[in-house]
Amino acid sequence: MSLLTEVETYVLSIVPSGPLKAEIAQRLEDVFAGKNTDLEALMEWLKTRPILSPLTKGILGFVFTLTVPSERGLQRRRFVQNALNGNGDPNNMDRAVKLYKKLKREITFHGAKEVALSYSTGALASCMGLIYNRMGTVTTEVAFGLVCATCEQIADSQHRSHRQMATTTNPLIRHENRMVLASTTAKAMEQMAGSSEQAAEAMEVASQARQMVQAMRTIGTHPSSSAGLKDNLLENLQAYQKRMGVQMQRFK
């Protein structure tokens, strides 16, 4: 799973199901693909979204700011700063500073995520706030590790389940990951289709998959309902590849 796919999975796992979730998923995909480069418009859109908690908006704002290239002098947004202040608790700020010092020594996404998972959500949010306010700098990869650790903690508390250190067992995250991977596979099928005889068939399968993912995000479904979605898509893709005589290992 690529880094950006993983970030998208974790961030979407804390967004409530509904039409807005499908819309946010599309914005994240566009931002990660470099298609949306107007950070100011994106932040204004995010600020006015209903339903989302201030912390979720803060995390999304942080992710957009990390990803979208912007002018150096661009003003930081108050709604993100307020969400990432650790509820104004000085203990959270103290822990955030300690965590920040540890993150400075990390160079990988997974290393940063593992270090961050031992801190409370308040401390993690405060640490994001430090980085967002330019009071500290870490690599984008490390910052994404911090984001995913925060989302995992929020998803865990939402599901009232205990975190496993080695692997993510949280069904909300697994469910979202299946849908993100299904979307990614659908995109691959569309790219492969080209002008071949089977192009129409491939486009149809990809289109159905996109609609299914969008419907699942909009209506909200039980985490187990997406279990077969990715497998069906991968089977379709492999059957299509076989007929085309194409091998694309990364989608297997």
Swiss-Prot record:
Motif Nuclear localization signal positions after renumbering to this chain: 101-105
Entry membrane topology: Peripheral membrane protein
Region (Membrane-binding): 1-164
Source species, domain of life: Viruses
Family recorded in the similarity comment: Belongs to the influenza viruses Matrix protein M1 family.
Chain's role: Plays critical roles in virus replication, from virus entry and uncoating to assembly and budding of the virus particle. M1 binding to ribonucleocapsids (RNPs) in nucleus seems to inhibit viral transcription. Interaction of viral NEP with M1-RNP is thought to promote nuclear export of the complex, which is targeted to the virion assembly site at the apical plasma membrane in polarized epithelial cells. Interactions with NA and HA may bring M1, a non-raft-associated protein, into lipid rafts. Forms a continuous shell on the inner side of the lipid bilayer in virion, where it binds the RNP.
Protein name as catalogued: Matrix protein 1
Organism (species): Influenza A virus (strain A/Goose/Guangdong/1/1996 H5N1 genotype Gs/Gd)
Lineage, top ranks: Viruses, Riboviria, Orthornavirae, Negarnaviricota, Polyploviricotina
